[in-house]
């Protein structure tokens, strides 16, 4: 059977990764830090993925979960994978888009340098039993907190349930290449 080992580590502290064995077949990186502190968030998100990849460089595939928050705001037009990047979450999460872009950059660099088969998956609006953006909107409504909408209406989102992206993990791992699949 295919098992998973969940390991808790502080990716901002490279030394905390010393607990990791080096014989993983696959690594799935769902980690994200949104503290608002640029130094810490860049260390945890960008340097952290690099340190993790260096520690696990003999894997069959590395899957890094990113976000569509990396894209520059472009109105109502759908985004292609090669759409311009930008800091579109700055108002609510000052460090989020930038640290996600930085993490993707470090992920690509290490994959190329170490020849690690890698896929970067940019999820849109993930949600599930443990919460997500829509859950936070419901909490805001319960508390009478207004939900800001972008003035360029309508506001389109592509919710993605955890069951759906988990089902795709084997395909995302199979698509991994050292050139990096996005």
Which residues fall in each region the model found?
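Glycine-rich NAD(P)-binding loop of the Rossmann-fold in SDR/ketoreductase-type enzymes
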Residues: 12, 26, 40-51, 90, ...
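Conserved mid-core alpha-helix of short-chain dehydrogenase/reductase
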Residues: 16, 47, 51-55, 106, ...
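Conserved Rossmann-fold NAD(P)-dependent oxidoreductase catalytic core, especially the SDR/UDP-sugar
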Residues: 51-95
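Conserved catalytic-core motifs of eukaryotic protein kinase domains, centered on the activation segment
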Residues: 34-42, 73-77, 132
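NAD(P)H-binding glycine-rich loop region in Rossmannoid oxidoreductase-like domains
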Residues: 4-46
């Amino acid at each position: 059977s295919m098992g998973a080992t969940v390991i808790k580590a502080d990716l901002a502290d490279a030394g905390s990764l010393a607990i990791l064995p080096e014989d993983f077949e696959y690594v799935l990186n769902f980690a994200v830090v949104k503290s608002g502190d640029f130094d810490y968030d860049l260390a945890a998100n960008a340097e952290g993925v690099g340190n993790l990849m260096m520690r696990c460089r003999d894997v069959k595939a590395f899957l890094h979960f990113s976000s569509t928050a990396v894209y520059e705001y472009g109105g109502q037009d759908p985004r292609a994978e090669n759409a311009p990047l930008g800091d579109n979450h700055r108002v609510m999460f000052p460090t989020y888009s930038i640290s996600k872009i930085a993490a993707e950059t470090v992920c690509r660099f290490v994959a190329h340098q170490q020849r690690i088969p890698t896929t970067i998956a940019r999820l849109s609006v993930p949600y599930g039993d443990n919460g997500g953006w829509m859950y936070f909107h419901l909490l805001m409504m319960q508390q009478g907190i207004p939900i800001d909408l972008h003035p360029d209406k309508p506001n389109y989102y592509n919710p993605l349930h955890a069951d759906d992206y988990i089902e795709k993990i084997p395909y995302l791992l199979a698509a991994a290449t050292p050139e990096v699949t996005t």
